[in-house]
Amino acid sequence: CETKAFDLEQSRQILTKAGSLGFPLKIHADEFDNLGGAALAAELGAASADHLVKTSDADIQALAKSNTVAVALPCTPFGLAEKDYTPAKKIIEADALFALATDCNPGTSWNESMQFVIALACRYMKLTPAQAIAASTINSAHAIRRSDSIGSIEVGKQADMLILTVSDYRQVGYRYGTNLVKQVIKRGRVYSVDVGYYQTA
């Protein structure tokens, strides 16, 4: 829902039709202009509204009253050399659910690293490392409606974890430009980043 893309009414038509066909709803909105896409997402019960750089205070309140996750994509304004970023602190202070993602695409955000996303969020959106990590894990799971099975380390959930080469979790927000991952655990299988083998946990 953006100028030069779909206007608010077109976005409503598309999302309403998609919802009637059983699709979960997501929208990219308010990246360059506030057309009301975030409030529309909240109204229609979308899983998430993404970008939200220009989202108004009133629309942030609408998100806070809904189950729609506000997803910031800081690599996009970084990649476009923009000065404005998603008002993450306002969103969190309003008690809206807030997540982070890469928006990986070849046009504006060719970045595959969530570690870099966290670093940008700490610098330009003033998140604490703890807030940025939560936004990248359990809150991101909420944004795809899978928080019941992934996103946190809990009994009964899928065993997806990263083992990092840091002595303090806060270094994830402080260090950037290098891969901090030592091992990946996916569905209980352990993958070594260095040598590429895996074993069943």
Where are the language model's segments positioned?
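Metal-coordinating catalytic core of metallo-dependent amide/deamination hydrolases
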Residues: 1-36, 104
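Residues that line or immediately flank small-molecule/substrate-binding pockets and catalytic motifs
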Residues: 3, 53-56, 166, 188
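Intrinsic-disorder/low-complexity, polar/charged segments
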Residues: 4, 113, 168-169
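Active-site-adjacent C-terminal substructures of enzyme catalytic domains
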Residues: 24, 34-149, 176, 190
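Acidic active-site catalytic centers that drive phospho-/nucleotidyl reactions
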Residues: 30, 50-51, 103, 160, ...
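C-terminal cap of metal-dependent C-N hydrolases
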Residues: 136-138, 158-201
